[in-house]
Curated annotation (Swiss-Prot):
Biological process per Gene Ontology, one example term: peptidoglycan turnover
Family to which this protein belongs: Belongs to the GCKR-like family. MurNAc-6-P etherase subfamily.
Record-linked NCBIfam families: N-acetylmuramic acid 6-phosphate etherase, PRK05441.1, PRK12570.1
Any one Pfam family match given in the protein's UniProt record, by short name: GKRP_SIS_N
SUBUNIT field: Homodimer.
Domain SIS, residue spans: 62-225
Catalytic activity: N-acetyl-D-muramate 6-phosphate + H2O = N-acetyl-D-glucosamine 6-phosphate + (R)-lactate
HAMAP family for the chain: MurQ
Organism: Actinobacillus pleuropneumoniae serotype 5b (strain L20)
Stored PROSITE patterns: GCKR (PS01272), SIS (PS51464)
Organism phylogeny: Bacteria, Pseudomonadati, Pseudomonadota, Gammaproteobacteria, Pasteurellales
GO molecular function, one term: carbohydrate derivative binding
Record protein name field: N-acetylmuramic acid 6-phosphate etherase
Domain of life: Bacteria
Length: 304
């Protein structure tokens, strides 16, 4: 796209408009300034609320993918890419899943997590190539993230995923974007102009983070990665998480600390297995068999 055409396109985007509520921010005190930002941030959850039907639809597709051996893959550039990588990286310790189940890809690679990479987002072929590098397939779900809804890198990835017959989801902060025209499911969190004109790391980025939280949390809950609202598949990889695992077992079973610690030791720090052992009054092998029979869903295993 020529510079003139790009300027015209940007001028039409809500995310590039000037916010009338922040025209004088360079004249405000610190307290007045953060009040303006806070007031604008209040619009974010309301914008996300309008997209709940589309978010739920995406969750159902992600659950289907997980159940059929597929993955959830996020792709984006800049802030959008970083948020995808962040959400993906939280899944293994929180839900005990392998890191390849939820994948975050950012334009420019790992260096782009900390440093801007010139022109990384402008290449549609690079988006396709980065998906090919992780062996993206029809079984996977691709979530393309870009506040503008027009990032070439993300568009290239969405087009490639669509050509394979994979489920495609777009997350943007401008309605009827180019990405939305490609994606099977379009999540348009229209949060309005930013406090700092064009700085989509602010409200748009916050909206993206809320949506990503929902996508992974709801999907993991639906495949049995929690019991009630407890993270029973948490990986006890440090002292804080080991203490949390003990607390989870105690709360789920109403046992005392000694029972929780002893059972966790037998269960090799597997909180879900320890809970199954205590509530079903079974040994480790039997508890493992019961959980396996019910695909790791603790509540179903206990009922049956």
């Amino acid at each position: 796209m020529s510079e003139k055409n790009l300027l015209t396109a940007l001028s039409k985007m809500i995310t590039e408009q000037r916010n009338p509520n922040s025209m004088n921010i360079d004249q405000l005190s610190a307290l007045e300034l953060v009040k303006v930002i806070n007031q604008e941030d209040k619009q974010v959850p309301l914008a996300v609320e309008k997209c709940l039907a589309q978010i739920a639809q995406a969750v159902e597709k992600i659950v289907q993918a997980f159940q059929n051996g597929g993955r959830l893959v996020y792709i984006g550039a800049g802030t959008s890419g970083r948020l995808g990588v962040l959400d993906a990286s939280e899944c293994p310790p929180t839900y005990g899943v392998p890191p390849e189940i939820v994948v975050g890809i950012i334009a420019g690679g790992e260096r782009a997590l900390r440093h801007p990479i010139e022109g990384a987002e402008d290449n549609t072929e690079r988006g396709k190539a980065d998906l090919q590098a992780v062996n993206f397939s029809q079984k996977d779900v691709l979530v393309g993230i870009a506040a503008s809804g027009r990032t070439p890198y993300v568009i290239g990835a969405l087009e490639y995923a669509k050509s394979l017959g994979a489920t495609t989801v777009s997350i943007a902060s401008n309605p009827n974007s180019a990405m939305a025209q490609i994606a099977e499911i379009a999540i348009d969190t229209v949060v309005g102009p930013e406090v700092l004109t064009g700085s989509s790391r602010m409200k748009s980025g916050t909206a993206q983070k809320l949506v990503l939280n929902m996508l992974t949390t709801a999907s993991m809950v639906m495949i049995g990665k929690c019991y009630s609202n407890l993270m029973v598949d948490v990986q006890a990889s440090n002292e804080k998480l080991k203490a949390r695992a003990i607390k989870i077992v105690m709360e789920a079973t109403e046992c005392d600390r000694t029972v929780a610690e002893n059972t966790l030791k037998i269960a090799e720090n597997n909180a879900k297995l320890a809970i199954m052992m205590i509530l079903s009054d079974s040994d480790k092998t039997t508890a493992e068999q019961l959980l396996s029979k019910h695909h790791g869903k603790l509540r179903q295993a206990l009922v049956n």
